[in-house]
Amino acid sequence: VSGPRTQAEPVTLTVDGSEVIVPKGTLIIRAAENLGIEIPRFCDHPFLDPIGACRQCYVEIEGQRKLFTSCTTEVAPGMVVRTQNTSDEAHRAQVANLEFLLLNHPLDCPICDRGGECPLQDQAMSFGPGESRYAEPKRTYEKPIALSPLVKLDRERCVLCARCTRFCDEISGDRFIELFARGAGERVSIAAGEDFRSPFSGNTVQICPVGALTAEPYRFVARPFDLTTADSVCQHCSAGCNIRVDLRRGSVVRVLARDNADVNDAWTCDKGRFAFRHADLPGRVTTPLIRDRGLEPASFGEVFADIAEWSREGRAAFLSGGRLPDEDAYALAKLARVAFGTNDLDHRRTFHGGRAEQLAAASPLDTTYRDLERAKVILVAGLDAEQEVPILNLRIRKAARRGAAVFVIHPRRTRLWDVAEHTLCLPEHQTYVLERIHDGEAPGDAFEGRVSGALREAAGEAVVLVGERLTEHPLAADVALRVAQRYGAHMALVPRRSGDRGALRAGVHPSLLPGGRRVSDQAERAEIEGSWGSLPAEPGRSTRQILEACANREIDVLFLIGIDPLRDIPDADLARRALSNTRHVVVQSLELGSLEPFADAFLPAAAWIEREGHATDWEGRSQPIHAVRGPTGVSRADWEIFEGLAEAMGRPLGFGDLGALRAEAAPLLEPRPVTSRSTAWTGTGRPQRLGELTLLAYPLLVDEGRLSEGADELKAALGQDPFVELHPEDADKRGLVDGGRATVTTEAGEAVLDVRVTEHIAQGAAFVPFNQPGLAANELLSGSFTTAVRIEPAVAEPAVAEGAA
């Protein structure tokens, strides 16, 4: 997607006597950094536009009569710069400016959360005045001011660097926090009556240089020197955000974003930042269990032996929750086929990826974040990036700021509404829209025509992003692939969960082996058999087909690895019947939860902060996960459990350690060519919608998911009560009003919900959040996240007269 780019002209300058060559347009402060020279600053941030607000980075430029702010001044050929290290004038200016900033700054370092890692504290100690000449009382404010349940403001600490407001304006686009008033009264605040309700609010806390903004979950919890830290990769979604995990006395107390310009820049979402307590909750089970008049503690060996006995006598199937690290996913794919002789394994909830899915399994890093930044056109289909892969949303916004044209096909208007053109259409119509874009025959004033024209003009510098909601419909992903192929664009399937791409690549799939090799293709299967031995040749069953087989008593042993069908599968009735009718259910997870009545064995898995491995993000980029602490109890990494199961079955996997596992997997997971011909959609005309309305149900960013357990402040800030969302015309036809109550009825079930009326949803569609507190949306579904629905005003319950019996 990159295409030809003009190389920036090199510029040679001198900083503190050392010569440096940098591209034209580089700021002086960055040129100094290239030489290892640190110029003090507060407002400057490498991922924000320069502003020169704090005036702390003054430098002297030879031949100029005044000092310059190095964070706003670009280099010039032959420029000679003197920083505070070699210029007395620059040093005096910085000391004076620091003294000015300290006039009203409180001396509360001993209780400030920024103490020990504060740039203002460091600079004051390094070259600031030892005593203040200011004799008047310092300015004070009410403290703390709760901007949201997550973010607190100690206003008297603020130095008005505008980092927080610039982040909201330039990066996230949700301008809840702003600078108000002017002069001595200028202050950071939010509008009266509003919360700082942003899924990226924690970034403002991390980039605040003085502790004016603090995070409620970390407030007064620890000092930097109390912490042990480790670098890792966030496991909440497929964004692949680089993070730092901080522990105090063995428990996670803070998560920070790490800089990586190729992935997350310097940001992470609030879910990744604040949902970190799940591994330490009381409900976690850290010892193996076996059912014997109830679930009783046992050794791993005892549980493995019982499972092996059950499995030798019957048929087994495996369902994974899509969050396994890459190594563990590979071990699971081998375990199912080698030790249990089955292709009945899947990590997907509902998915029709077609050839696009095979390409994603075989060709990692085909489309990247960098491609998005360079793209002239971005087409987003069936993906609500902010709710599903939040950092991807920020990168799309970044591309839009640089001039990219962004188009979105979705039933709901996403948070990209201010930088993208949307077409709101029912799920079953999205394939039709894509086919019209592919044909390129729509009139130029139609959405499809504008997208076709933009893709044509982009001449290959375009990206097509396909979300899970699109892939629920057969052939939709293949049609999107045909669009990308016709216009020379890159395409990526964007899964929601952190382990989905790695599981697909590793072969946790009923019809694909590692590297996207087809089970049904003898030659491709033979490539894996050379390492694994003889494999079953018939493709297995998908997640839904496995559950149906369990419900029909065709499966004897069902392995649930990090998945709870009662919560995760869009068909609660099928999940209950499957669990009830399966002879033996084996649960491998951190907790039992709602599966306790059905589990015959429990295998305690180590949390992601307790083990080593790799995680593959939506791009196909594999990044290392590092253990922050040792396993809790006797829990084990998933791959170690799989090895123990295989040995009990008499078919050891032969790994021994992670190094051996990786050595075996590496050649089988190398990128390989795949014939990319996709299947054409054969629909005629615009498809007819099903039923009165089409109900959509998919998870929002903050839900009742297991990784969000314990994140009470996050849920208070961003969580939502259950609701049903409709278009105004659909609401009017049914006598529904915003804020009222409605009865939502499908073939599967019924619920009474609050009504939200908005033009941000397609006419003919209704939306309910999946897995929200107080609503089990899968009770309304029958195997897909969309279904026909009837919605009508709720009948008020008759009032009971006062004093009545």
Task: Kindly give the residue locations of the regions a language model identified.
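N-terminal export/assembly segments and adjacent metallocofactor-ligating motifs
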Residues: 2-27, 33, 45, 60-64, ...
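Glycine-rich phosphate/diphosphate-binding loops that line cofactor/substrate pockets in enzymes
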Residues: 303-316, 368-376, 450-463, 487, ...
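Short acidic (Asp/Glu) and glycine-rich catalytic loops that position anionic groups and cofactors
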Residues: 74-79, 183-187, 283-288, 375, ...
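Short, charged, surface-exposed secondary-structure boundary motifs
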Residues: 354-358, 417-419, 432-438, 502-503, ...
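A generic structural motif
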Residues: 342-354, 403-413, 488-502, 582-595
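A cross-kingdom feature strongest in bacterial/archaeal respiratory oxidoreductases
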Residues: 2, 39, 44, 333, ...
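Long hydrophobic segments that form regular secondary structure
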Residues: 249-257, 261-266, 271-280, 287-288, ...
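A glycine-rich, hydrophobic/aromatic-adjacent loop/helix-cap motif
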Residues: 462-551, 619
